[in-house]
């Protein structure tokens, strides 16, 4: 079976290139978010797999749901997806579009896992330090995990910084076993 990421990638890339050239990346991300949410609702998902409907009818169903929130160029994009029976890929296309947009803006979502809830000042200080280290704009996403005991674990893309007490105890245990 073909990976949905592989199928969605060219659509996301084409959409991002078009939206960037038209300086409409934010608007396209909003339209992709709306249409992706629509295709994930059970009623719409059922219509998209209905063999009695043509590809054009499926696109029209989605376009009617999103009417007033999508423009003509996005409607054409939906028709392109529909003609290739790829409307169900919209959530993955949206996800990949968001990644491309973040890369272009040099922005990065960073998961900050801590034992206790961090206040706004702590998150801001952490974001500033990470922005300097990673040379990107950082958007911290706080996650509370009491199992860490103390400290934080930071996940930024492929980078993981484990400054938790649990992580240090695990390293100490490994050193003692050696």
Swiss-Prot record:
One annotated Gene Ontology cellular component of this protein: plasma membrane
Membrane topology label: Peripheral membrane protein
UniProt keyword Ion transport present: yes
Subcellular location: Cell inner membrane
Keyword tags: ATP synthesis, Cell inner membrane, Cell membrane, CF(1), Hydrogen ion transport, Ion transport, Membrane, Transport
Family annotation (SUPFAM superfamilies): N-terminal domain of the delta subunit of the F1F0-ATP synthase
GO terms of molecular function: proton-transporting ATP synthase activity, rotational mechanism
Family indicated by similarity: Belongs to the ATPase delta chain family.
Record text on subunit structure and interactions: F-type ATPases have 2 components, F(1) - the catalytic core - and F(0) - the membrane proton channel. F(1) has five subunits: alpha(3), beta(3), gamma(1), delta(1), epsilon(1). F(0) has three main subunits: a(1), b(2) and c(10-14). The alpha and beta chains form an alternating ring which encloses part of the gamma chain. F(1) is attached to F(0) by a central stalk formed by the gamma and epsilon chains, while a peripheral stalk is formed by the delta and b chains.
Function: F(1)F(0) ATP synthase produces ATP from ADP in the presence of a proton or sodium gradient. F-type ATPases consist of two structural domains, F(1) containing the extramembraneous catalytic core and F(0) containing the membrane proton channel, linked together by a central stalk and a peripheral stalk. During catalysis, ATP synthesis in the catalytic domain of F(1) is coupled via a rotary mechanism of the central stalk subunits to proton translocation.
Protein's name in the database: ATP synthase subunit delta
């Amino acid at each position: 079976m073909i990976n949905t990421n592989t199928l969605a990638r060219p659509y996301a890339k084409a959409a991002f290139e078009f939206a960037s050239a038209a300086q409409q990346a934010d608007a396209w991300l909003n339209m992709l978010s709306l249409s992706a949410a629509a295709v994930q609702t059970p009623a719409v998902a059922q219509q998209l797999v209905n063999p009695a409907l043509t590809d054009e009818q499926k696109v029209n169903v989605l376009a009617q749901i999103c009417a007033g929130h999508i423009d003509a160029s996005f409607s054409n994009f939906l028709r392109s997806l529909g003609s290739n029976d790829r409307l169900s890929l919209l959530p993955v296309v949206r996800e990949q579009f968001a990644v491309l947009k973040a890369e272009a803006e040099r922005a990065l979502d960073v998961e900050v896992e801590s034992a206790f809830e961090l206040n706004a000042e702590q998150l801001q200080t952490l974001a500033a330090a990470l922005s300097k280290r990673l040379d990107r704009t950082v958007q911290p996403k706080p996650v509370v995990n009491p199992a860490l005991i103390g400290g934080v674990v930071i996940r930024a893309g492929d980078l993981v910084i484990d400054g938790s007490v649990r992580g240090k105890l695990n390293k100490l245990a490994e050193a003692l076993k050696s």
